[in-house]
C-alpha cells in the first residue's frame, strides 16, 4: 500500500510538472520581404502618350508619366459633361425628369449617320434627362451629349463655358473644352492629371451620376450597345469610369476600382487598341492596390490638442482639422508615420471658430507626406477686464523669466 501511494504521488507530481510546463510561443510571423525593399516601378504602358495612378482618398499621384502633358481627351470629355449636368441639377437648374429633345443638330452632328458613337435616340425624339445621360455615358453617344448641352445651356458653345468654369472650380488647371462630346477640335485639350482630378471629383461630389458608368449595356429602341470599358467584365472591383477614342487621341481609358476601403483612379491616354488600354489599366490598378494603402489619420472636428489661451473667457481652446487628414503610404509602413504639431507658444483671445492657429504635419522616414491647418474648434471670447489685466502681468512675468534665463 505504501509503495502504491508513493507511486501515485510521484505520478501526480510528474503530471503537475508536465501541466505547468509553458507552451512554447509560436514563431513571430515574418514580415514580407517586400515591406523592406523599394517599391517596384509601376508597369508603365509601353505605347501610351501619358498615364498615371492616383489614390482617390488623398489625390496623390502614386506613379505616372507625362501627367501634365497636353493630350486630346476624346470621349472622356463626357465625364466633364456629366459633372456639369450633375452640378446644375444639384443647383436646381435642371431636373432628372426634364424631357430632353434629340434635336436635328444633335442627331446630324453626332447620331447614327456619323462615324462616331451614338445613343440610338431618333431625331426629334424626347427622353427624360437621366435616360439621355445614360445614353451618353454607357453608349458614349455624341448625339446625346449635344442634346444635353443644348438643354442645359442652349448651345454647345454656351455649355463649353460651363465646362471650363466647373473645371477651374475643381482644380483642373491645364484643360480647355470647346464641345461636350470630345470629337477632335482645336483648343480642346486636357492632361492625365486633370482627368484624374475630374474623375475623383465626380465620384466624390455626385455618386449617383458616377454610378451610370458601371452599367454594362443599354438598350435604346431596338438597339442594345455595350459599355466599351472592358474592365467592367474583367475585374469586379472596377465600377467606372470612361473610355475614349479618336484617330488623334488614340485609345484612352480612365478607370476606377475599389477594393475594401481603398479606391484608385487610373488614366491611360493614347494607347494602341481597345484591349491594350484595358490590359494596361488593369496592371496599373493591381500595382497600386498591391503596394499602397490609404489611411484616415484624423477626423474633422476631433480635438487633437488643447493649448492654453491668455486673456480669454476660457483658458484653453480645442484645435483640430476642418477636413479629414488622409495619407497614402507604401504597404507595411503605416507604423513609421510620425506626426507633429506647430502651434504658437502663446495664444491670446479673442479666437474665432475655424481660425487657423497652426499646422499638423505627418512624416514618413523624415519626408513630409501629409499636412493640414490646425483650426480652433470653438470660439474663445475675451475675458473680463481684471482677467485680462492679470494675464497681462503673468505674461510679462513669464517673458521676464525667459529673458533672465537666457542671460544666465
Where are these regions (language model features)?
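Compositionally biased, proline/threonine/alanine/serine-rich low-complexity intrinsically disordered stretches
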Residues: 19-45, 382, 386-389, 393, ...
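Hydrophobic alpha-helical segments, especially transmembrane helices
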Residues: 3-5, 79, 259
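Short, low-complexity, intrinsically disordered N-terminal peptides in bacterial proteins
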Residues: 1-5, 404-407
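Sterically constrained small-residue positions within well-ordered secondary structures
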Residues: 10, 42-44, 64, 257, ...
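Active-site-adjacent loops and short helices of periplasmic peptidoglycan-processing enzymes
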Residues: 20-193, 200-206, 218-221
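Domain-terminus/edge residues, biased toward the C-terminal soluble/receptor-binding domains
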Residues: 172-176, 184-408
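Short, compositionally biased leader-like segments
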Residues: 10, 20-30, 321-335
